[in-house]
Amino acid sequence: MRVVSLTSPPDACRAAAVSRAFRAAADSDAVWSMFLPRNLPRFAKGELPRTPPSSKKELFRRLSDQPALLPHKLMSMQLDRATGAQRFTLSARALQNRAPVASLSNCSKGNKRIFSEAAQFYRVNELEIRAKVQRKMLSQNTTYAVYLVFKLEYVYYEFGFPYEVASVGVAGRESTRLVSVQGNIKDGDGDGNAPHRHIFQGCRGTLSCDAITSGEDIHFPRENADGWMEVELGEFHNDEADDGGEVSISFT
């Protein structure tokens, strides 16, 4: 049992298939409690069944199968199925936006996004998004990547800057990178050239943007199956001994 608890959730599932004796050990609460975070956050009402899961393994399955909303429903948490690390997603209401927000639209129809609202921006000459996350909420001794999830409408207004500066800071250390939301890596032809930026139908006619030169180190988004885009803003390591402070994220 001790050996199984030092492996990973997938390894424990494989061990359970070996024999009945292995299954009894691999499915035990003693093993699966090692894969769950030491201090699970509180969840919003109704996120977990009224009847508690019958075992630690069932609780792990629930929290890894789909995200669970935290109190106030501004943030969600999901466990990584392979490692048990906690992954958090912040809603539009949890972000600090400097650009004018036209509305908070309902985005729950036709997709499986856990948050029902998304911020809509119009006439964006300057976009600034900031967020903070308490480090004590995160899994220790784990490297995290930070992503921005968004959609860019085909018809847009005054979105004229080629890229933004993304920054992720923790414990006095900060990493920055250039990020473009107007290109898509699927546009590349596969020979290492930078992808071309899309042609958008603007409010004053069709606007064609030049390609970003290949000499610039620009990070581009990927399109998910649900139609939303995501682009990595940076990464950081949450050390085992660091349980205080916060992670500062900016997109300016």
Q: What does each model-identified segment do?
A:
Residues 12-13, 31:
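Secondary-structure boundary/capping residues
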Residues 1-12, 21:
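The Skp1-binding helix-loop-helix core of N-terminal F-box domains in SCF E3 ubiquitin ligase adaptors
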Residues 2, 20-252:
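Plant-skewed but cross-kingdom recognition/interaction modules and surfaces
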